């Protein structure tokens, strides 16, 4: 349907409820897997007497698990019982966080991270990208995904200060129990509300023509086998990897870095939560820009602004109270494209012929970046005593992202679908 509104054929359009459900899942599952890491770094490393790189290695295990899980479940979600996969995966992640809470040594975190990696992958971007692509067409898809994925930012803004207070007053083990409970809520909400396709509720996809609501295999574009033979595919995957390589370093190390810059523990946690709050604004902004000015412009703008964020971080030790504003604003606006742009880039560059498999490949690329970025930043800190070197490397990587995305859209002109 071309018309975009709250109702379709006289009934409230259920896709809007799914947008809110996605917001909740991102608020709890994404924040609970990734965004909260930095507030645990200091208390856990001090409790076990380990360096930051050793602790943050669990995030590498988590995200490498996510790469494998995405490869296995991407097609199964697109073609099979998506809701069942999400519910079971959320419960698996809850068990993982209970292992964290009961940890007797650092290797407990590595085992638990495998379970959390399953929940992180199967309860956040991958299923919601598939669901929202089924329910919403190109006229509104970017904005809808922006509102959905903004949950990770809003969730961080709300949850991070609360979690920091829990850790301060009751200990980090209690903090991990709270995260296990959050994944229990994810399972419950998913069981009640997730609906994979509009046809299951008697609707058609909103924001597209009737012809564009055909089955994915009948839509125009490339399948995964055709896509992997093009430079465009590998370049766009590289940009997704590089964006998350930098982002994961901020998520995992921001609070310790702000403390190194002279902020108190409470102020550092507050600024880290502001980072995530600004990310909420950025996701809505980038989604809106992609809808109104095109995915090309929105995705390139995202990479450029994100690079300015890393430059601000590199300059923070010189004047923390000034450059922190640039870091927070640019991280939020630029980082807003990290989850919003990849599914839109799949539509823009490869069409909908094999959307589920190609978006799964994009998800694998983002997870690969997350697997190494935060840990490498921690290792560089352990070696040099500073994060500045990493921030400079990340800023250079964002310049590469911009160039690669420009090239991809030039290559796209060769294809007629």
Residue positions per predicted region:
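Extracytoplasmic gate region of multi-pass secondary transporters
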Residues: 33-41, 225-286
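Helix-loop-helix hairpin linking two adjacent transmembrane segments in secondary transporters
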Residues: 148, 152-199
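Intracellular juxtamembrane helix-capping segments at the cytosolic ends
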Residues: 44, 122-136, 337-350
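Conserved MFS/SLC helix-loop-helix module at the cytosolic interface between two early adjacent transmembrane helices
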Residues: 68-106
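Helix-to-loop junctions at the C-terminal end of transmembrane segments
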Residues: 69-81, 283-294, 381-382
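Extracytoplasmic
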Residues: 17-43, 48-52, 73, 160, ...
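C-terminal transmembrane helical hairpin of 12-TM major facilitator-type secondary transporters
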Residues: 273-279, 284-285, 290-345
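A late C-terminal transmembrane helix in Major Facilitator Superfamily
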Residues: 147, 156, 349-384
């Amino acid at each position: 349907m071309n018309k975009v509104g709250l109702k379709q054929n006289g009934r409230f359009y259920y896709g809007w409820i799914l947008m809110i459900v996605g917001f909740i899942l991102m608020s709890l599952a994404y924040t609970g897997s990734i965004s909260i890491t930095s507030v645990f770094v200091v208390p856990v490393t001090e409790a076990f007497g380990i360096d930051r790189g050793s602790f943050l290695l669990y995030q590498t295990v988590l995200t490498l698990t996510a790469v494998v899980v995405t490869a296995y479940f991407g097609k199964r979600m697109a073609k099979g019982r998506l809701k069942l996969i999400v519910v079971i995966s959320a419960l698996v992640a809850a068990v993982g966080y209970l292992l964290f809470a009961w940890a007797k040594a650092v290797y407990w975190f590595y085992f638990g991270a495998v379970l959390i990696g399953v929940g992180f992958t199967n309860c956040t971007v991958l299923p919601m990208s598939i669901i929202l692509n089924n329910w919403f067409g190109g006229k509104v898809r970017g904005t809808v995904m922006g509102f959905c994925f903004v949950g990770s930012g809003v969730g961080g803004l709300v949850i991070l200060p609360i979690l920091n207070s829990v850790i301060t007053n009751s200990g980090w083990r209690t903090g991990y129990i709270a995260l296990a409970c959050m994944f229990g809520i994810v399972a419950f909400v998913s069981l009640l509300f997730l609906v994979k396709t509009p046809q299951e509720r008697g609707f058609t996809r909103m924001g597209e023509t009737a012809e564009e609501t055909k089955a994915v295999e009948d839509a125009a574009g490339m399948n995964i086998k055709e896509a992997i033979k093009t430079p465009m595919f590998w370049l766009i995957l590289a940009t997704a990897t590089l964006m998350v390589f930098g982002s994961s370093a901020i998520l995992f190390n921001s609070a310790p870095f702000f403390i190194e810059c002279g902020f108190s523990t409470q102020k550092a946690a507050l600024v880290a939560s502001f980072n995530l709050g600004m990310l909420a604004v950025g996701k809505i902004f980038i989604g809106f820009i992609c809808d109104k000015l095109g995915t090309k412009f929105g995705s390139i703008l995202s990479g450029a602004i994100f690079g300015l964020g890393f430059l601000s971080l590199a300059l923070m030790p010189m004047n923390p109270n000034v450059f922190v504003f640039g870091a927070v604003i640019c991280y939020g606006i630029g980082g807003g494209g990290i989850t919003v742009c990849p599914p839109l880039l799949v539509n823009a560059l490869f069409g909908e012929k094999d959307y589920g498999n190609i978006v799964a490949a994009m998800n694998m690329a983002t997870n690969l970046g997350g697997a190494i970025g935060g840990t490498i930043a921690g290792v560089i800190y352990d070696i040099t005593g500073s994060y500045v070197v990493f921030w400079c490397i990340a800023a250079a990587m964002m310049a590469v992202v911009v160039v690669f995305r420009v090239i991809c859209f030039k290559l796209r002109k060769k294809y007629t679908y």
